[in-house]
From Swiss-Prot:
Protein name listed in UniProt: Protein male-specific 40
Taxon lineage: Eukaryota, Metazoa, Ecdysozoa, Arthropoda, Hexapoda
First-listed, main subcellular location of the protein, grouped into a coarse class: cytoplasm
Further comment found in the protein's record: Mst40 sequences are organized as a tandemly arrayed 1.4 kb repeat unit. The repeat is conserved in all D.melanogaster strains examined but absent from other Drosophila species.
Keywords annotated in UniProt: Cytoplasm, Nucleus
Amino acid sequence: MFKPGYSEAKKPKITDEFSYKQT
């Protein structure tokens, strides 16, 4: 699942990327 911040930034932040991989 893509996080809101992921879509807005279009670039996964370190924390966002980690959460993305966890989901």
